Amino acid sequence: MLCGLSKPTSGIGKVAGYDIFREAEQVKKHIGYMSQKFSLYEDLKVWENIRLFAGIYGMKEQDIERKTEELLDRLELTAERDTLVKSLPVGWKQKLAFSVSIFHEPRIVFLDEPTGGVDPATRRQFWELIYRAADQGITVFVTTHYMDEAEYCNRISIMVDGQIKALDTPARLKQQFGAETMDDVFQKLARGAVRKAD
């Protein structure tokens, strides 16, 4: 819903200043998205994926050229520019997918389980990319099941049974629930949930 792909049945929502009910196309123009499964085309080369997504977002040719080289250099993928994406290690794919999702400099980027299946060192590198994007003024919206990873965020929203049960900074949530970790906070909220019979 927040990405403008499906319409909500009720309520109010705005993303990047646009109403998700009436301005879904504007929402799509001002966001980036990285899915849980890779959002790259496996049978395209690294540089082809970058150019494809840049073109989809309507970037100018001279900007695409310049930024492609900068991105390849920053990710240390210059030597792999002509490599098919399916040949890259999982961590490299994740970093490339994230970088492509913000290539057009959106106001907000949605990351769906972005570090699933990668080793701890790659997770740390990935979060450095997230921090860099945030420093550039991009709002980063992360969904994760890794509560230790949630600690890296400025604000956390915890949903239980489709409803937001908590929303605050990690420190305040831990204080509010008398917990040492975000995992403890989540456990307390989940245990307190009333389950409906199937």
Q: Which residue stretches match the model-derived regions?
A:
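ABC ATPase "signature
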Residues: 167-168
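Conserved catalytic motifs of ABC-family nucleotide-binding domains
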Residues: 105
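Catalytic Walker B motif of ABC-type/P-loop ATPase nucleotide-binding domains
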Residues: 109-113
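Conserved ABC ATPase "signature" region
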Residues: 51, 55, 62-80
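Conserved ABC transporter NBD signature motif
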Residues: 11-22, 26-27
